[in-house]
Curated annotation (Swiss-Prot):
It comes from Campylobacter jejuni subsp. doylei (strain ATCC BAA-1458 / RM4099 / 269.97). One of its GO terms (biological process) is threonine transport. GO terms for cellular component: plasma membrane. It is a multi-pass membrane protein. NCBIfam families: PRK13628.1. It catalyses: L-serine(in) + Na(+)(in) = L-serine(out) + Na(+)(out); L-threonine(in) + Na(+)(in) = L-threonine(out) + Na(+)(out). The keyword tRNA processing does not apply. This is Serine/threonine transporter SstT. Involved in the import of serine and threonine into the cell, with the concomitant import of sodium (symport system).
Length: 407
């Protein structure tokens, strides 16, 4: 009987389960502060599990990605689309930073006061702090959650192992798969953790806490829509000198719609390939560009990482300099490309960006937990942007005469 319940839960729809957890958490938070305090243990366990797995996830994900990817077969078109993917992701992160400067959001977090570890004020201090974090001992970086150190050693390790044997690379691929399975297991427990977090948040902060979550969600979705209809439109126009919107709306109807519900760029690859075929793009090209885009084209993830990191900074009272904002754009671009194929991957990489501002690791993980609460909508919109942009950029780089008469 018990095993059947577990199997039924494991096969259930995560979105519905999270919604149920949110609704039940609000109900308990309003009616019983005592039960909310007990339920908060589930939230603490969930955030602790995320804190434990996140450093290892970032390290093995980036190391494996660098040492196993092979672009030796890349022709001019593939090189162009790689550049376009990176530029698009960078511009998306830059837009997210500007959006946060114009419409800053502060979260109501229980027990969080103004930071006692402020961000460095001068350029020299910033670079000194960055350098010491970068050259940190790799074991210490993993154990302390120093994501800049983790990132450095992952890149160095991936580059050093680039030319190792296929058998050795397979070992890292298998380890990567193992870590991803653990992450998927932890994420599958999100409804219980979110139930506890929401119950405690409502009991402690009332409607004000939920209102701050709503403002954050609106900012995220609005920024992603801006990237879709303004940034992507400008990229298409400058690349083709043609009206971008017919192609954009085709990509939204035939790619974004499905990606919104699957919440997975990888799962949407067959849909995107079928759309490319209907558009009249060469199979040899989209056969490489679409899977590649599902791996490195992560504009939506960059928006999520940048906005939630800056929201964490706003919450603890850190003022961000222009240099730090520029560095965040670069980090968000790189980190977003490592978020592919991971449920909630962009959320788990937020501590990496937060480390740029000396934000306490516990606070960063509380923001990650809030990301899971609003992720029911945020992750769907993020995936829709990521996946539809794969087709959009593939189409303009293909140089084929496109078929716009698609039903």
């Amino acid at each position: 009987m018990f095993s059947k319940i577990i199997q039924s839960y494991a096969k259930g729809n995560l979105i519905i389960q999270i919604c149920a957890g949110i609704a039940l958490g609000i109900l308990i938070g309003i009616n019983s502060k005592e039960i909310s305090e007990i339920a908060n243990l589930l939230g603490i366990l969930f955030t602790s599990a995320l804190k434990a797995i996140a450093p290892m996830l970032v390290f093995i994900l980036i190391l494996t990605s660098i040492c196993t990817k092979d672009f030796s077969q890349s022709g001019v078109k593939i090189k162009n689309i790689i550049i376009l993917y990176i530029v698009g992701t960078f511009l998306a992160s830059a837009c997210a930073i500007l959006a946060n400067f114009f419409f800053p959001v502060k979260l109501v977090l229980d027990g969080i006061q103004a930071t006692t570890n402020p961000s460095p004020a001068h350029m020299g201090e910033i670079f000194k702090d960055l350098l010491f974090k970068i050259v940190d001992n790799p074991i210490n970086a993993l154990s302390s959650g120093n994501y800049l150190g983790i990132l450095t050693w992952a890149i160095a390790g991936g580059a050093a192992l680039k030319h190792c044997s296929n058998e050795a690379k397979q070992v890292f691929i298998d380890i990567n798969e193992g870590v991803l399975k653990i992450v998927k297991f932890v994420v599958k427990l999100a409804p219980f953790g979110i139930f506890g977090l929401v119950a405690n948040s409502v009991a402690q902060t009332g409607a004000q806490g939920l209102l701050s979550y709503t403002k954050l969600l609106i900012l995220l979705v609005a920024t992603m829509l801006f990237v879709t209809f303004v940034i992507n439109a400008l990229i298409v126009f400058f690349y083709t000198r043609k009206n971008p919107f017919p192609l954009i709306f085709i990509c939204l109807r035939h790619s974004a719609f499905f990606a919104f519900f699957t919440r997975s760029s990888a799962a949407n690859i067959p849909v995107n390939m079928a759309l490319c075929a209907k558009l009249g793009i060469d199979k040899e090209f989209y056969g490489i560009s679409i899977p590649l885009g599902a791996t490195i084209n992560m504009a939506g993830a960059a928006v999520t990482i940048a906005i939630l990191s800056l929201t964490a900074a706003n919450t603890v009272g850190i003022e961000i300099s222009l240099l730090q904002a520029f560095l965040l754009s670069i980090i968000a671009t790189f980190a977003a490309s490592g978020a592919s194929g991971v449920a909630g991957g962009s959320l788990l990489l937020i501590p990496l960006a937060c480390s740029l501002f000396n934000i306490d690791y516990d606070i960063a993980m509380k923001v990650v937990a809030i990301g899971f609460i609003i992720g029911v909508i945020q992750d769907s919109v993020e995936t829709a942007l990521n996946s539809s942009t794969d087709v959009l950029f593939t189409a303009i780089c293909s140089k084929n005469e496109l078929n716009y008469n698609i039903k």
